[in-house]
A protein has these predicted regions:
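Generic non-transmembrane alpha-helical segments
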Residues: 41-50, 98-102
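Short, flexible, solvent-exposed loop/turn segments with mixed acidic/basic and small polar residues
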Residues: 68-78, 113-116
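Acidic, His- and aromatic-enriched active-site or binding-groove loops in soluble protein domains
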Residues: 73-93
């Protein structure tokens, strides 16, 4: 099932953990609508900006899958409202800064950020619905959450260093 021009449902439901443990990871119609909203409001604009394919590393998670990986059943992933992703060759911090400045989102987290490894970690972004997004921005280093994104040096719209 095609969710948007560049994204298919399978990209959001595939899970090695679900496969290994025999967990059904199938979203309902409301979850699928939410995934489409994430595509249109977050992923398609990001893909257009950076002109590169996006790799979805985690999308929809059933409650059983959330439990199996130690995530909360109330996670926005369980509602189809969140996505974790990367863009090969683009520092995750650059993607996060662009989303913060240009997209309507509920929560944006630069996950497992390491300033010495710009390709490390990933971007988590969620979308709730127009008018109810919190615009919460966090950085997670693997131990604790900090408000906002790290300060970076920029030149010509690119992260320096």
């Amino acid at each position: 099932m095609q969710l948007s021009k560049h994204f298919k449902l399978i990209e959001f439901t595939k899970s090695m953990t679900a496969t290994r443990k025999g967990i059904k990871n199938e979203p309902g119609s409301g979850d699928i609508k939410n995934l489409g909203d994430v595509c249109y409001e977050i992923l398609e604009p990001v893909r257009a900006k950076f002109e590169k394919p996006i790799t979805v590393t985690s999308g929809y998670r059933s409650e059983a899958l959330c439990e199996a990986i130690g995530s909360k059943k109330t996670s926005q992933h369980a509602k189809g409202q969140a996505v974790d992703f990367e863009i090969s060759g683009v520092p995750n911090i650059q993607v996060a800064y662009w989303i913060q400045a240009n997209c309507d989102f509920d929560q944006l987290i630069l996950e497992f950020y390491d300033p010495d490894d710009p390709a490390g970690g990933w971007v988590h972004c969620s979308y709730s619905e127009k008018g109810s997004n919190r615009k919460q921005v966090l950085t997670y280093d693997g131990k604790s959450y900090e408000d906002g994104l790290p300060d970076m040096e920029w030149k010509d719209g690119q992260v320096v260093g």
